[in-house]
Amino acid sequence: MLLNILFIVVGIALVLWGADRLTDGAVAVAEKMKMPQIVIGLTIVAMGTSMPEFCVSFISALKGTSDLAVGNIVGSNIFNALLIVGVSALVAPMTIMETTVRKDIPFALVASALLLIMCLDGNISRIDAGILFVMFLIFMYMTLKGAKKQGADAEEAIEGEGKKPMATWLSVVWILVGLICLIGGSNLFVEGATAVATNLGVSEAVIGLTIVAGGTSLPELATSVVSARKGNSGIAIGNALGSNVFNILTILGITGMITPMTLKGITYIDLSMLVISIMIVWLFSFTKYKIERWEGAVLTAVFIGYIYSLL
């Protein structure tokens, strides 16, 4: 048991560190290729923050633990919508950007509802996954099309990424090291989490919805809390809910096209909770485009109640 717990701790550490290194290297290469900063921010940096979820879910699906793969995504998204937004609002009331209310939250809601419908038969087929990925391409097109209007925000989000040019050889090294750590760490993490679930008599779905989801989402929580303290909470909530869209449409889309997934432990309650959590955030965001501290407390309480119901 202790060895498996060590696998989980070391695995998540490698995944998080590897994702950071891979993103740094990829951004440096993109800058040397004269790729526009806004495109870097909306693609490489955004995808880099979801790389832990991607690798853990992808490896889980390949190993035949579909509940762990989907549980990680569903749990991470609930974590993002309820705990990250809730705790950030408790730290400081959140002012929400109009584009988040009008585009990001509705798209996250549609993606979550679509996932719920697709899982009614207990499977995510290649066709289902293909539909999700096509939706991601549409979302990216809409995002890049509106990038000129959000240019200042995007520059701020990636501020500092290219201040010190990185040598090409070092960029390549970081990309390779990042990939190795992501793959190796994901394998350790999945092996440890699966073994712990077996030893405790807990389903892989519950482990995915709690330990795995929480572990892969910790960087977003830390970043959002710091952003809230510095008065940049609007960017934090946009990133959290934008990550929800990427997690469902891209991670489950790509993973499902490669290896269809059969769900056993992920229930309609879990998927419905995902939809409800985003609906609550959307409802709160309409009050003067702000989420107050009491609303943050409600979101946090709902998250705690949900996790308690799983245990």
Language-model segments: what does each one mean?
Residues 1-311:
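Hydrophobic alpha-helical segments, chiefly the membrane-spanning helices
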